């Protein structure tokens, strides 16, 4: 089981103390950690796996699989939401959850800035003393997920690899948009929350034009989400609004461009979450994303 120090509700259990002087840790039931030492990237990554209720009791059943970026934060959150909203299969279809963890030895910011961004940033600063800032390895990371993470998950868990979902927020949403425009059939569904489309002078919007110039279809189901405060305050008095990046406008522009091509196998929806900003929107966005991608059968 995966151990966390969290103040969250069931399905967490309290493990037996390892020593009399140490308080017990909080663990997430039915979870595992797999470590991949990537030869291609030269780094180690933890892959967090959460199994649905009844997984062991139904050996003939295969499950859809949700991959979520920023696992350190997103995995326990999605796990808890799936437990509560899923309501034993009545609210959501049961699924296997795979959390994509950060590289060992990196801070979360260093790892995600490198792995989730599609190009370098000349103005970047490093949050790791003695290490230069590093951005722009989203394509290498995408290949790592496809060639190393996918085989591990398929070989060890009863998943339906024809029902893969990718969910990401902020830089994770930027990475999801990169995958969508690079290899759209890598996943069947995409939950893209508050993507950092502003990155590198909106490089993803340029990639969208390049994709459209050489393709006549984009076969994927896509949910785009953003908070209503992720735009600029027209009177500049409300601190809940963004100060410089109009992420709501960028998302609308991305949506309109995708729709304009009338791709025959693209299904796209957009949800603006009222009353939420960039840091508060994800719990609601992923809840709606689960309901959209995995409705109860």
What positions do the PLM features span?
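Bacterial N-terminal signal peptides
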Residues: 1-11
């Amino acid at each position: 089981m995966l151990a966390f120090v969290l103040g969250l509700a069931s399905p967490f259990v309290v493990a037996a103390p390892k020593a009399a002087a140490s308080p017990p840790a909080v663990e997430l039931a039915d979870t595992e950690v797999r470590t991949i030492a990537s030869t291609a990237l030269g780094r180690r990554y933890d892959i967090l796996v959460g199994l649905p209720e009844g997984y062991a009791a139904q050996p003939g059943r295969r499950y859809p699989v949700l991959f979520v970026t920023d696992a350190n934060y997103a995995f326990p959150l999605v796990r808890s939401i799936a437990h509560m909203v899923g309501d034993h299969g009545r609210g959501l279809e049961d699924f296997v959850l795979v959390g994509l963890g950060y590289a060992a030895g990196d801070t979360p910011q260093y790892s995600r800035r490198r792995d989730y961004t599609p190009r370098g940033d000349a103005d970047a600063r490093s949050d790791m003393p003695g290490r230069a800032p590093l951005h722009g390895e989203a394509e290498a990371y995408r290949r790592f997920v496809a060639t190393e993470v996918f085989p591990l998950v398929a070989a060890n868990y009863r998943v339906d690899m024809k029902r893969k979902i990718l969910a990401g927020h902020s830089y994770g949403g930027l990475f999801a948009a990169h995958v969508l425009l690079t290899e759209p059939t890598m996943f069947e569904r995409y939950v893209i929350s508050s993507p950092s489309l502003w990155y590198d002078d909106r490089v993803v919007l340029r990639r969208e034009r390049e994709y459209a110039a050489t393709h006549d279809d984009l076969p994927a189901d896509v949910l785009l989400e953003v908070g209503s405060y992720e735009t600029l305050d027209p009177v500049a008095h409300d601190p809940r609004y963004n100060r410089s990046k109009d992420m709501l406008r960028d998302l609308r522009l991305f949506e309109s461009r995708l729709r304009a091509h009338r791709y025959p196998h693209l299904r796209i929806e957009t949800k603006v979450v009222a009353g939420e900003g960039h840091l508060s929107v994800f719990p609601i966005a992923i809840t709606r994303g689960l309901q959209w991608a995995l409705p109860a059968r």
